């Protein structure tokens, strides 16, 4: 009888731990007030409990605090369950080009599942450049190549503009890009 009780208790603990993982950063602070770093603080309604918003998206963090398209895509973060990743290189589909392009180049296509895009090689000493990558909608496009960052940082999928500092309303740490 004691064994059955232990099995029921262990099952309840496993279910509770699986269902009590982080639900995402879109909610308005579901935990109780515990200072500035939990509940209504760091992940909730305000930075340090002062109402500025960090990941709660009601203030300085804004909607651009993470990739807007990927935050709603369950495959990119595991939904409500924790995701464990490794540093092993992915295997499968790989696309590489050893070509040199001059002038205007137009590339169109879709890659399946979640993937990455990168450019490597020598860039001009002047000019602009970048990669426009939409996670989850299949849109990958090299838009521009740049050495100098633009004055306005563009966010994907309808996220608000950041004015060369962090995201959202433009306050926070300096832009590392």
From Swiss-Prot:
Which Gene Ontology cellular component annotation is one that this UniProt entry carries? egg chorion
Q: Name one GO molecular function term.
A: structural constituent of egg chorion
UniProt xrefs under Pfam families: Chorion_1
Keywords noted in UniProt: Repeat, Signal
InterPro entries xrefs? Chorion (IPR002635)
Q: Which GO terms describe its biological process?
A: chorion-containing eggshell formation
Q: Secretion signal: which residues?
A: 1-20
The similarity comment for this entry is:
Belongs to the chorion protein family.
This chain's function reads: This protein is one of many from the eggshell of the silk moth.
Protein name from the UniProt record? Chorion protein ERB.1
Whose protein is this, by species? Bombyx mori
Q: What is the lineage of its organism?
A: Eukaryota, Metazoa, Ecdysozoa, Arthropoda, Hexapoda
């Amino acid at each position: 009888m004691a064994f059955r009780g232990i099995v029921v208790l262990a099952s309840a603990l496993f279910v509770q731990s699986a269902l009590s993982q982080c639900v995402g950063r879109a909610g308005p602070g579901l935990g109780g007030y515990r200072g500035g770093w939990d509940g209504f603080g760091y992940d909730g309604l305000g930075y340090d409990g002062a109402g500025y918003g960090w990941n709660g998206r009601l203030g300085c963090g804004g909607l651009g605090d993470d990739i807007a398209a990927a935050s709603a895509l369950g495959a990119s973060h595991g939904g409500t369950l924790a995701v464990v990743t490794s540093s092993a290189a992915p295997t499968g589909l790989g696309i590489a080009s050893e070509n040199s392009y001059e002038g205007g180049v137009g590339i169109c296509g879709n890659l399946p599942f979640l993937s990455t895009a990168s450019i490597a090689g020598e860039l001009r000493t002047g000019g602009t450049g970048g990669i426009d990558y939409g996670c989850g909608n299949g849109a990958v496009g090299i838009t521009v190549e740049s050495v100098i960052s633009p004055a306005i940082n563009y966010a994907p999928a309808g996220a608000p503009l950041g004015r060369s500092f962090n995201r959202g309303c433009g306050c926070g740490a300096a832009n590392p890009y």
